[in-house]
């Protein structure tokens, strides 16, 4: 097991994967590289309406791996709301070399795929807005 640098120096045994998408083999292999081969991944395939949904789903997990909009990510990483580490996958958008028809436009365009490029810990998200 790897100890992640957190306020509590948590030994990571279980990771919540909160995403509508199944974790890829590359993502899982990389998590095992980071946290150890014995890591348990708890998948929740849902859409969150609030950061509280993620906290509830991950109440028994040590790390929260998420795919969330910026405002919800800001709430989840706020130390008043959550003390657990929050991580997210990094992906590269790579051309496949094939052309496909975009159903929205009817035009032919280059096809892309996403390749896992690592994990990052989200320390803080700041959302600054201005009403128009």
Residue ranges of model-derived segments:
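Long, low-complexity, Lys/Arg-enriched
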Residues: 1-62, 74-132
């Amino acid at each position: 097991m790897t100890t992640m640098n957190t306020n509590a120096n948590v030994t990571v045994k279980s990771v919540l994967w909160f995403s509508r998408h199944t974790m890829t083999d590359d993502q899982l292999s990389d998590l095992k590289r980071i946290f150890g081969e014995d890591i348990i991944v708890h998948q929740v395939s849902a859409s969150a309406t609030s950061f509280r949904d993620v906290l509830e789903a991950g109440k028994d997990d040590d790390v929260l791996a998420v795919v969330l909009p910026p405002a919800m990510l800001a709430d989840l990483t706020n130390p008043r709301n959550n003390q657990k580490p929050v991580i997210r996958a990094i992906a590269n958008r790579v051309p496949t070399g094939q052309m496909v028809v975009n159903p929205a436009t009817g035009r032919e365009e280059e096809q892309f795929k996403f390749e896992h490029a690592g994990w990052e810990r989200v320390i803080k998200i700041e959302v600054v807005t201005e009403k128009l």
